[in-house]
Regions:
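Generic preference for well-ordered alpha-helical elements
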Residues: 9-13, 25, 36, 54-57, ...
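Conserved strand-to-loop turn within each blade of WD40 beta-propeller repeats
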Residues: 9-13, 21, 54-58, 66, ...
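Structural hallmark of WD40 beta-propellers
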Residues: 3-9, 17, 28-30, 48-53, ...
Length: 380
């Protein structure tokens, strides 16, 4: 990830580290904290060079203060509410802070809900890892969609919330456009259509207008961030699987620019907090800085005319076939029954062949999808 700060804070695998750039150009790093799983994103407190928050695939949100080099575990983001309590944690990819209110943070990850928390209500003494969200945001058509997740979040200067989904689009919600603390699980517990419809219409003060949508990029391969740019956050920016940096006008979603940012994929985009400079990074081994210094005004492109770039990397989508699952279960039963090791060897050989056959089928399936992916750069 990329963060622009007086001291460059970074996430490396499951570690949260601080890197201090010396006068001679050397960089010294020190460990501040860890997650049980990868840590994708940090959120720096607006106006503070010392305080920031991290989130990780363990669902944990941590608070850091560089003046003390200590980490405080605030809460674990839970998936949904059941009669017996909150279920398994959400694998978090994104965290952001409201620049108008540093007590408000939003997190998102392995499901469709972006959850907003008031950190003043968290247990800072470690007595509990539970925290109730104050609000949740999600496009109505994605509320029950289990195939999408959130890869990027950003608050604007107007407290609007920007959400980027994998295999989907980018959505902008007004400040009062949330669905309540736990809309998804509330319908499960009450279990009738009347309560469900009442949940969405109970408050006339909530802005239920359709969110602004930004389309044209492709967000399928990796975890991509999203951000606002401009002195008053007039624009929205995101990376794409086609190796470009996309820019839209915030107020109406009009596509403005697509700039070549990486040989493969652009993942991270961060604006400088004070000057008009953008940092971007992706699969390449460098970070690129962008400034509005062109001598001529750029021509506005038609997003439908953008040609995709051949990817150098591909994520494999591997699903265990039914016969492989049954074979594993049968092998386990035979081993527990004490059958001889020669049979186990034959089982393992057969199991390996099944895995290779499944991988071959998955490869052919991916190859057949290439024609669909090369129609344009848009995932829409």
């Amino acid at each position: 990830m990329v963060i622009i700060s007086s001291e460059v804070t970074i996430c490396e695998c499951n570690q949260v580290r601080v890197a201090k750039i010396q006068d001679d150009g050397d960089v010294l790093t020190s460990l501040l904290g860890e997650h049980d799983g990868r840590a994708h994103k940090l959120a720096i407190e607006p106006g503070s060079p010392y305080i920031f928050y991290s989130c990780g695939e363990d669902g944990l949100v941590q608070h850091f203060d560089l003046r003390t080099d200590t980490a405080t575990e605030l809460f674990i983001c839970r998936n949904s509410l059941t009669k017996s309590g909150y279920s398994s944690h959400v694998h978090l990819n994104a965290i952001t802070m409201d620049p108008r209110n540093p007590n408000i943070i939003a997190v998102g990850g392995s499901n469709s809900l972006a959850r907003v928390y008031d950190i003043r209500k968290c247990k800072w003494d470690g007595s509990s890892d539970f925290a109730q969200p104050s609000d949740c945001y999600c496009p109505p058509h994605l509320i029950d969609n289990r195939s999408v997740g959130i890869t990027g979040l950003a608050f604007s200067h107007q407290s609007e919330l920007l959400i980027s989904y994998n295999d989907e689009k980018i959505y902008l919600f007004p400040k009062n456009g949330g669905l309540g603390p736990d809309p998804k699980s509330s319908t499960k517990i009450e279990g009738n259509e009347g309560s469900k419809s009442a949940m969405f219409t109970s408050s006339e003060s909530v802005d239920r207008s359709a969110p602004q949508v930004y389309v044209g990029h492709r967000n399928c391969e990796t975890v991509k961030g999203v951000t606002f740019i401009g002195p008053n956050h007039e624009y929205v920016a995101s990376g794409s699987d086609c190796g470009r940096l996309f820019i839209w006008r915030k107020r109406d979603g009009k596509f403005l620019r697509a700039m070549e940012g990486d040989e493969c994929i652009v993942n991270c985009i961060e604006p400088h907090p004070h000057v008009m400079t953008i940092a971007s990074s992706g699969i390449d081994n460098d970070v690129k800085l962008w400034t509005p210094s062109a001598n001529e005004r750029a021509q506005v492109l038609n997003v439908e005319e953008l040609k995709p770039r051949k990817r150098k990397a591909k994520l494999w989508h591997f699903a265990l076939p039914e016969e492989l699952v049954w074979h594993v279960l049968a092998s386990r039963r035979r081993q527990s029954a004490g059958e001889d090791s020669s049979a186990d060897l034959e089982d393992n050989t057969e199991l390996l062949n099944l895995v290779l056959q499944a991988a071959d089928r998955d490869s052919l399936s991916d190859d057949s999808d290439e024609d669909e992916e090369t129609s344009d750069c848009s995932g829409s």
